[in-house]
Amino acid sequence: MRFHTLLFLSFLLLVSCALICTAQHPGLKKSGMFHENVGKGQHIEKKRSCIERMQTCEVEAGLPCCSGAPCICPYIGDCICIQ
């Protein structure tokens, strides 16, 4: 009986940690918001198109980012253009 209680509490702790992490790091969620990206001295409005963390966006993959330039998505935050 104690084993089952300990197992259940461990599961609850794991789920709560995952929920807290997701709430504190909105960059891990899919984002469809527009924002400004500074590139070569001008402001370019773009849409975040990297879907998963550490995913590389390529024009061939149908995931344009930074006006069609390749980019990398960090764990937290916006896409980083490779120019």
Swiss-Prot record:
Any single GO CC term annotated in Swiss-Prot or TrEMBL for this entry: extracellular region
Superkingdom classification of source: Eukaryota
Tissue spec: Expressed by the venom gland.
Keywords: Disulfide bond, Ion channel impairing toxin, Knottin, Secreted, Signal, Toxin
Keyword presence, Signal: yes
Gene Ontology molecular function: ion channel regulator activity; toxin activity
Main location: secreted
Proregion positions: 24-48
Disulfide bonds: 50-66, 57-71, 65-81
Compartment list: Secreted
Leader sequence segment: 1-23
Family (UniProt): Belongs to the neurotoxin 07 (Beta/delta-agtx) family. 03 (aga-4) subfamily. JZTX sub-subfamily.
Function: Inhibits TTX-sensitive sodium currents in rat dorsal root ganglion (DRG) neurons.
Record comment regarding domains: The presence of a 'disulfide through disulfide knot' structurally defines this protein as a knottin.
Protein name (Swiss-Prot/TrEMBL): U25-theraphotoxin-Cg1a
Protein source organism: Chilobrachys guangxiensis
